[in-house]
Amino acid sequence: MIQYVVKRDGRRVEFNNQKIVAAILKAMAVTEKGEDIVLAAKIADKISHLNKSEMSVEEIQDCVENELMNGPRQEVAKKYIAYRNKRSLARKAKSTEIFQTIIEAQANDVTRENANMNADTPAGMMMKFASESTKPFVDECLLADDVRAAVEKNYIHIHDKDYYPTKSLTCIQHPLDIILEHGLKAGHGESRPAKRIETASVLACISMETVQNEMHGGQAIPAFDFYLAPYVRKTFEEEVDKISDITGEDYSALKDVKLDDYIRRDLAGLRGSERALQHAVNQTVSRTHQAMEAFVHNMNTIHSRGGNQVVFSSINYGTDTSAEGRCIIREILNTTYLGVGNGSTAIFPIQIWKKKRGVSYLPEDPNYDLYKFACKVSARRFFPNFLNLDATYNQDDAWKADDPKRYEHEVATMGCRTRVYGNKFGPKTSIGRGNLSFTTINLVKLGIEAMQASEDRDERLRIFFEKLDWALDMAARQLNDRFEFQKTALKKQFPLLMAGLWLGSGKLDDNDTIESVINQGTLSIGFIGLAECLIALIGKHHGESDEAQELGLRIVEHMAGKINGFAETYQHNFTCLATPAEGLSGKFTKRDKKTFGIIPGITDKDYYTNSSHIPVYYHCTPEHKAKIEGPYHKYENAGHIFYVEVDGDATHNPEAIMRIVDLMDKYDIGYGSVNHNRTRCLDCGYETAEPNLDECPHCHGHHLDTLQRITGYLVGTTNRWNSGKLAELRDRVVHK
């Protein structure tokens, strides 16, 4: 008697003869004689009593065909065979169609899912082949049936599902001091500890490049200035030794001089030790600048993940007030301002200025001059973004101004917005930690279903919150299932990540599982489309209605509360994410359109609004936007971002950037950035803020590249954006 069925993907499931009955009745229903439930049950019963303990799906279907062909209803056999062949062709056709678009390098939402990936190259094509092949395996083999149904019905989205079988984690804030002080082993080579700024810069690149191959998300350095500062000093001391060697004079005492700053100055009129000191400073600044140039250049040219994607890198800086730390900050800003190559804007690393009162924000602060410079650089090059360490939820009582390692108590962020700080299972820090995986809830679908279920507003909201709780429970259970799968990975699967970079991993042996250390990371539940959800529930979004704002905050606060509860239930660091939604914004919308049709203000565009943002098409002032979006950030502890679109050439108006940072300070906003248009001629390098240009005003060439921020990061060309994000870009309005 059959007990188990072997599915096409290799899974063994319990045999259920009612599935045979249902399949036969479906074939009978399209014949003249119609259904015969007695015959269908008789055939199913005969097959189920075959002298086999298990059979494959194909074997069972062969048996059904034989029984039908040898029975009184041969016309049913023909319908059954035709349907079986049709389903087989459909399965093959779907994969074939997707693969064909990759082969032909077609620009569509499959090949443009990730704007940082070039899917047209051979390596990029291989990545997409693997990605599209893996997702069905995950659906069939790794997801619970109800989770798979929730994904198929567009309620939730599992991010980086193609990496699910690899057991990889999402991202990490690199404790770079470990690499710099102890060296590293990568591939067939190994590096000694850094002794100068150039080596430190290269090791920073190698660390992020190597670990990106072991993870499916981004790489970040939480305290770029603090980590590299000691190597500025080592470089200075090396320059002093060079001077002694060249001149034959003993200038070793200069190595003990405490410098107030590293500023390049003319040597004219200087003599003896004073001249030697300034020359050493000048050389150190020059070498530091070149090291920062090399770092930025490498981050934009060294490919990772099979050779088709540059490292999705971020660096945090701004709070090191030492002379050496300030030198690092100044030269990374100088490098960014000047651009790379022919003066183009560097796409990576995403740079993040740590804004903190008493350190790097107010006129009397020691790094205020560098803060002003950072705003000038951001006005021209989009970066740095701004991280508000003064936000109430970003402050840490352990932070002390005289602590040389105070950066350990400073929140760091990465990429579009990812934030990891609170910790139930270890130190409260960003360093050596990251996200494990995240899943997003489609708030819009829940809102539409509640809208259609009742005309009474109170009843509608009751239904919505009931559905929201169901979706939250589903997402939490799915993330816990993925965690249970991830924790079985062995340390040796992540040779550099788990060699001491991930918090606590240094104690693991190669064949140990990572179970004991990955709980230092976070599991995040995100959301998309709050604005459209509010329109469905009460007819207006939160940017245009106080009532909608009140409800929006109630929804997100409710989500955050439930997610905090999951942390206790599952004993993991669960957090609430304002999902960045690059490819997802269009995917959810496209499917909901098929289900609900075009609903004005809700499904009438090709995208849903990002997380808790005001819709991009809504005209308002920067302050209104800050006032509305700011209160959500305290609930979105897995990450959030505030952005403002500015008009004209921001290059000549860095004060506008400073005013926006002031709004962040005023409205308790955690992380923000400024968007503006930048069009560059690829022939002559001319740059302008003029949008929609067809011809370069300088050389009259037509090879123009438009640079814009897609979610929280830049893309070298909008040609790589998917259709949903391109539609959103067209709808963006200036906030003024």
Pin down the residues of each PLM region.
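Charged, amphipathic alpha-helical regulatory modules used
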Residues: M1-A105, D109, A727-V733
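Conserved catalytic cores of very large enzyme subunits
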Residues: L89-A90, S95-N519, K540-H541, S545-D705
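Long insertion/accessory domains within large nucleic-acid-processing enzymes
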Residues: L693-K736
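Contiguous, well-ordered alpha-helical segments that form the cores/surfaces of helical PPI scaffolds
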Residues: K26, L523-A536, E557, R709
